[in-house]
């Protein structure tokens, strides 16, 4: 029996099994097996991925990468040509884009690579069409933009989320707060700092055994599910922010536009009428989580034309130094910062390498002679 057949059998058994406290352990083991077989399926295809055609090995460019993912003919190519200087072939029929087409989106002084990927079809993660390659490229992204047709049913969104989930991409989620450490002896030790309501210790041990893990320390700091534990054990999941972009709002009612616009992580646009494209750009910038930092030489005005772009999660003075030149931090003496992160704003504050900078701060770095 092949891997695909095993996956289908497990999915069928899970569909037949009622979800309750009595079946929790059994379902947990089935999920562990399913995740293992899906990983085997993807690893088995990775060797031939580079030979499958041109256009998928696209080098990263700019300060980050956002990918456009969606079913064929939702308007990804049109959007790319509208917001970047790149032309991606667009037509009124499906499967126009056959390779990954990169463009550069300029927002708030930052250049962000925007990739128009071939249209995903249902079953992509199982190898249909070129979908598995498409979703694998999405794993390299700093932001996923799922493009949807506002005139079509809501299940298109669920199908795309399912395909991305199967390939190991987790949208708008944080990694589970679980510390998992394998060891050579001593058995399984499980410590929980919170009550577990979505799984139990027996299921946790069963999942570990399903992966042939017999010696490990597990510290659980949040109320996790069996899926969260499996994600932690595998360690190859990608947690990515996601924007849901509904196109063709010029073809639906105002009430429907209002309903979609109120959904979380959602932007509504019309490529045909150029509606909300600037709003989309701003939301992409916000979702990617960048800080714009300006530099200032001693005795000179701040350089407002060429800002440094730094991820908010890494926005320390050390990261500012690395953005200029990696050798600067070794000669660093101190820095003066003006802006939101300064205690004395609008006056400057003298800070060290660990100081966290904020959006639109101005920094002046003093080095040792």
In which residue ranges do the predicted regions lie?
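C-terminal-of-GTPase-core extension/linker across diverse P-loop GTPases
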Residues: 16, 22-64, 69, 74, ...
């Amino acid at each position: 029996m092949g891997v695909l057949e095993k996956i289908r059998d497990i999915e069928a058994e899970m569909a037949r099994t009622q979800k309750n406290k009595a079946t929790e352990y059994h379902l947990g083991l089935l999920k562990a097996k399913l995740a293992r077989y899906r990983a085997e399926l993807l690893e088995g295809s990775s060797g031939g991925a580079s030979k499958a055609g041109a256009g998928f090995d696209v080098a990263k460019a700019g300060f980050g990468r956002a990918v456009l993912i969606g079913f064929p003919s939702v308007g990804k190519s049109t959007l790319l040509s509208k917001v970047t200087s790149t032309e991606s072939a667009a037509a009124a029929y499906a499967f126009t884009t056959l390779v990954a087409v990169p463009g550069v989106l300029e927002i708030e002084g930052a250049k962000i690579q925007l990739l128009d990927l071939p249209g995903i079809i249902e079953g992509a993660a199982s190898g249909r069409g070129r979908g598995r390659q498409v979703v694998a490229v999405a794993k390299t992204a700093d932001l996923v933009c799922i493009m949807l047709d506002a005139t079509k049913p809501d299940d298109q969104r669920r199908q795309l989320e399912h395909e991305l989930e199967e390939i190991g991409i987790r949208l708008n989620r944080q990694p589970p707060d679980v510390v998992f450490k394998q060891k050579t002896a001593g058995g399984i030790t499980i410590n929980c700092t919170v009550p577990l309501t979505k799984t139990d210790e027996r299921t946790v041990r069963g999942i570990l055994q399903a992966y042939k893990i017999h010696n490990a320390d597990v510290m659980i700091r949040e109320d996790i599910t069996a899926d969260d534990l499996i994600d932690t054990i595998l360690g190859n999941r990608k947690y990515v922010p996601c924007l849901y972009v509904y196109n063709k709002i010029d073809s639906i009612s105002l009430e429907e536009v209002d309903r979609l616009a109120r959904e979380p992580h959602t932007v509504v646009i019309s490529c045909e009428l150029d509606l909300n494209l600037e709003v989309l750009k701003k939301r992409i910038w916000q979702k990617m989580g960048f800080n714009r930092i300006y530099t200032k030489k001693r005795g000179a005005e701040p350089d407002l034309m060429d800002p440094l772009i730094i991820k908010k999660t890494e926005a320390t003075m050390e990261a500012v130094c690395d953005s200029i030149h990696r050798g600067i931090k070794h000669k660093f003496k101190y820095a003066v910062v003006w802006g939101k992160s300064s205690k004395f704003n609008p006056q400057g504050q003298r800070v060290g390498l660990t100081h966290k900078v904020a959006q639109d701060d101005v920094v002046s770095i003093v080095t040792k002679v």
